[in-house]
UniProtKB/Swiss-Prot annotation:
Biological-process GO terms, alphabetical: killing of cells of another organism
Gene symbol of the encoding locus: AGT1
Residue positions with a glycan: N100, N139
Protein keywords: Glycoprotein, Hydrolase, Lyase, Magnesium, Metal-binding, Nuclease, Signal, Vacuole
GO cellular component: vacuolar lumen
UniProt protein name: Ribonuclease ageritin
Signal peptide (residue range): 1-21
Industrial and biotechnological uses noted in the record: The strong larvicidal activity of ageritin makes this protein a promising candidate for novel biopesticide development.
Length: 156
């Protein structure tokens, strides 16, 4: 595993009486190192992902170049909504291309696994690379994506 740096930032939600959530930010040298770390983070508590229950997660952020495209995997709730556990995001304000992960057994525990080299890219370069990554998971099952991201290697 390549070296990574870790930072914790407090994210304070709006509203009274709500405890702040902390997001751990870690920097990785490669896409596969970041994806492996993200999946390991999701499974790092007492609960583990049952990949047979995974569904694809589609971006709902209209400002994203990946709007309405598959960007990750999650689980469907009883109410029918999809909770993402690992998704690939892009940020032009400091995190570049990164995986967002939520621990399955503690939804307040969050990880941003940043692809270090993408932070200093121009917005155009970053967007192009991000869309190449998104194209790579297009038309793939949630199980395929999970196995790829969990191991760092696309299933045969």
């Amino acid at each position: 595993m390549s070296e990574s740096s870790t930072f914790t930032t407090a994210v304070v939600p709006e509203g009274e009486g709500v405890a702040p959530m902390a997001e751990t930010v870690q920097y990785y040298n490669s896409y596969s190192d970041a994806s492996i770390a993200s999946c390991a983070f999701v499974d790092s508590g007492k609960d583990k992902i049952d990949k047979t229950k995974l569904v694809t997660y589609t971006s709902r952020l209209a400002a994203s170049p990946a709007y309405q495209k598959v960007v990750g995997v999650g689980l469907k709730t009883a109410a029918g909504s999809i909770v993402p556990y690992v998704r690939l995001d892009m940020d032009n304000t400091g995190k570049g291309i990164h995986f967002n992960a939520t621990k399955l057994s503690d939804s307040s525990a969050k990880l941003a696994a940043v692809l270090k080299t993408t932070v200093s890219m121009t917005e155009a370069q970053r967007t192009q690379l991000y869309m190449e990554y998104i194209k790579g998971i297009e038309n793939r099952s949630a199980q395929f994506i999970w196995d790829w991201w969990r191991t760092g290697k696309a299933p045969a």
